[in-house]
């Protein structure tokens, strides 16, 4: 997940000046990375992140924007848990922070999607919502056939809200449920690049696009090589089969074959795997490939007619299955 780490590291260091955007990012980050807990009758706000720089950014923003102190707890990897996790926790007046960030509505009920001020905000709020969601639970796969930018969501309402935010940015995202988890996915390569640019991950976009271009060039080269190999195999099989038919034609016609058709037939027998164009260059005087093909075609037609008259196997009988599979 090298690309994911690079994007999160870049986004966690991004400087955002507009207060509304910073608030939207914090609200989204808390919504996608954490939750509300009741501890000893008090509301506690928690967010679990996989990046230390993201945790530091969240802690700083909570203090500067909302005036709350938070603790960061480091949980090291072990057992089933992979990688170090960072838990940002606000215990003192957690309910106040939950209301300020829109995690609780005015009646004190948990908001299941994204807060109203984010959903009804401008494009910058949609960008910030996506930035917070990606820092919380986003992933970016390497460019390729199944490349994707994906965010794991706390529920279907949050997933739909994130899809709506992408739509306001002109980017198509889809929500789906995978193994019981709600996810929002962007699969189109151009859309992934556009979204990363909107989030502010400019260096990561350049790196991702470079890898994407390298992979596409490699894939195109492989396709062309396979195409050329297949064409060569088909041409070789056709040439071998044609030589077998010509050999049978000369047996049927014997000395009655016209000289100009005989020359073309003998060229084919002498150079069984050569292309028609190469046969034309070997002729004296040189001929076009169409002229060579025409003469061989007339030679075969004449021989097949003679075979029908004599009740003998025609030139096609000389072509075996092994020749076509070679």
Curated annotation (Swiss-Prot):
This chain's function reads: Involved in cell division and chromosome segregation.
Question: What keywords would UniProt list here?
Answer: Cell cycle, Cell division, DNA-binding
DNA-binding positions are 275-308
User: Does the keyword field hold Ligase?
Assistant: no
Organism this protein belongs to:
Saccharopolyspora erythraea (strain ATCC 11635 / DSM 40517 / JCM 4748 / NBRC 13426 / NCIMB 8594 / NRRL 2338)
Which Pfam families has this protein been placed in? HTH_WhiA, LAGLIDADG_WhiA, WhiA_N
Q: Which InterPro entries match?
A: Homing_endonucl (IPR027434), Sporu_reg_WhiA_N_dom (IPR018478), Sporulation_regulator_WhiA (IPR003802), Sporulation_regulator_WhiA_C (IPR023054), WhiA_LAGLIDADG_dom (IPR039518)
Name of the protein in its database record: Probable cell division protein WhiA
Q: Which domain of life is it from?
A: Bacteria
Has keyword Chloroplast? Answer: no
Q: Which family does it belong to?
A: Belongs to the WhiA family.
According to the UniProt entry, the coiled-coil residues are none
Q: Some GO term, biological process aspect, for this entry: which one?
A: cell division
Q: Name one GO molecular function term.
A: DNA binding
Q: Which residues form the signal peptide?
A: none
């Amino acid at each position: 997940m090298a690309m994911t780490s690079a994007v999160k590291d870049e986004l966690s260091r991004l400087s955002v000046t507009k207060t509304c955007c910073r608030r939207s990012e914090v609200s989204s980050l808390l919504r996608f990375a954490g939750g509300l807990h009741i501890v000893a009758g008090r509301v506690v706000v928690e967010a679990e992140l996989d990046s230390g720089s993201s945790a530091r950014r969240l802690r700083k923003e909570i203090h500067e924007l909302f005036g709350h102190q938070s603790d960061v707890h480091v949980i090291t990897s072990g057992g089933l848990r992979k990688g170090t996790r960072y838990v940002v926790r606000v215990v003192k007046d957690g309910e106040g922070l939950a209301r300020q960030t829109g995690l609780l509505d005015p009646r004190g009920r948990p908001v299941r999607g994204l807060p109203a001020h984010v959903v009804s905000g401008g494009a910058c709020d949609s960008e910030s919502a996506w930035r917070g969601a990606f820092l919380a639970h986003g992933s970016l796969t390497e460019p390729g056939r199944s490349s994707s930018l994906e965010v794991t969501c706390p529920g279907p309402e949050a997933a739909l809200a994130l899809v709506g935010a992408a739509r306001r940015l002109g980017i198509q995202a889809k929500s789906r449920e995978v193994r019981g988890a709600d996810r929002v996915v962007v699969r189109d390569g151009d859309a992934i690049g556009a979204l990363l640019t909107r989030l502010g991950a400019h260096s990561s976009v350049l790196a991702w696009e470079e890898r994407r271009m390298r992979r596409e060039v490699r894939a195109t080269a492989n396709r062309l090589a396979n195409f050329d190999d297949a064409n060569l195999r088909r041409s070789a099989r056709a040439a071998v089969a044609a030589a077998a038919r010509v050999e049978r034609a000369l047996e049927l016609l014997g000395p009655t074959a016209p000289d100009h058709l005989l020359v073309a037939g003998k060229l084919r027998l002498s150079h069984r795997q050569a292309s028609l164009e190469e046969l034309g260059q070997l002729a004296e005087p040189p001929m076009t490939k169409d002229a060579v093909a025409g003469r061989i075609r007339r030679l075969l037609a004449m021989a097949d007619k003679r075979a029908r008259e004599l009740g003998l196997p025609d030139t096609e009988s000389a072509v075996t299955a092994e020749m076509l599979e070679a």
